[in-house]
Amino acid sequence: MHAYLHCLSHSPLVGYVDPAQEVLDEVNGVIASARERIAAFSPELVVLFAPDHYNGFFYDVMPPFCLGVGATAIGDFGSAAGELPVPVELAEACAHAVMKSGIDLAVSYCMQVDHGFAQPLEFLLGGLYKVPVLPVFINGVATPLPGFQRTRMLGEAIGRFTSTLNKRVLFLGSGGLSHQPPVPELAKADAHMRDRLLGSGKDLPASERELRQQRVISAAEKFVEDQRTLHPLNPIWDNQFMTLLEQGRIQELDAVSNEELSAIAGKSTHEIKTWVAAFAAISTFGNWRSEGRYYRPIPEWIAGFGSLSARTEN
């Protein structure tokens, strides 16, 4: 069967700290074009690789990877909220297949997800509920982090499973590219934040969640004025990364350590492993070609903003 892929940066700052209208129109046009291509493909199943930002996963249990057999979006930063349409039996079968392939994939029957999962479903499919989805969490912020090699192997395992389903499968990768927004770190946290990172942050009071979101908005506003206030975006790295993906050379990323990636492009750049997993997955379907490449550094969203599609040729 055929597969389609789309990888897209996300940002909670969309609608809160936006770039100039010209840039916003350009990005919206890119997303609209991707949405049209996906609609023409008419997927029967979505596999969504996405990270979390201490909204669903915490240090009480922090797996490198987790498949949501059931999942609910919390609606942070005004993103869509509600249950994701996960086909339970298919998700269970996927988990068993991935485990048999040698990848230790955690499962959750009540996975809580944030804008990292919700935005691509909203932007590219028109909502959370349009197509059955297998949501796959890839840890991108909480050390210790999975590396490129293991993430690639996860994508390959999921790709091999879905290639047997006789369905039109859409692989989505959500996150990146270079960026380092103000995300708390356990090693530097005070007692209150440590408690939140250990699990109490899963049910934040509305007032505290609003303060947290306002801190991110304020950081973006300062970053627009002075890009020395956060780790700088790295367009050179971002474009080199996208070229590796387009050329099917993702295995070369195995040699890039987590520490090196953080230093080059920022500590939240590890979200790009969702893109690696998606490209690894589609590679198991046979020959493919990329299309729709777009990139622009957008300080207002604290992100090197990228968009890239691929389709199988068989």
UniProtKB/Swiss-Prot annotation:
Record-linked InterPro entries: DHPP/DHXA_dioxygenase, Xdiol_dOase_suB
Substrates-to-products reaction catalysed: 3-(2,3-dihydroxyphenyl)propanoate + O2 = (2Z,4E)-2-hydroxy-6-oxonona-2,4-dienedioate + H(+); (2E)-3-(2,3-dihydroxyphenyl)prop-2-enoate + O2 = (2Z,4E,7E)-2-hydroxy-6-oxonona-2,4,7-trienedioate + H(+)
Reported cofactor(s): Fe(2+)
Alphabetical list of SUPFAM superfamilies matching this protein: LigB-like (SSF53213)
CDD domains: MhpB_like
EC number: 1.13.11.16
One annotated GO molecular function: 3-carboxyethylcatechol 2,3-dioxygenase activity
GO annotation, biological process: 3-phenylpropionate catabolic process
Iron listed as a keyword: yes
Pathway field: Aromatic compound metabolism; 3-phenylpropanoate degradation
Active site as annotated: 115, 179
Domain of life where this protein originates: Bacteria
Keyword annotations from UniProtKB, A to Z: Aromatic hydrocarbons catabolism, Dioxygenase, Iron, Oxidoreductase
NCBIfam families tied to this protein: PRK13370.1-1, PRK13370.1-4
Function: Catalyzes the non-heme iron(II)-dependent oxidative cleavage of 2,3-dihydroxyphenylpropionic acid and 2,3-dihydroxicinnamic acid into 2-hydroxy-6-ketononadienedioate and 2-hydroxy-6-ketononatrienedioate, respectively.
Stated family: Belongs to the LigB/MhpB extradiol dioxygenase family.
Subunit (UniProt): Homotetramer.
The protein, known as: 2,3-dihydroxyphenylpropionate/2,3-dihydroxicinnamic acid 1,2-dioxygenase
Source organism of this protein record: Escherichia coli (strain 55989 / EAEC)
Gene that encodes the chain: mhpB
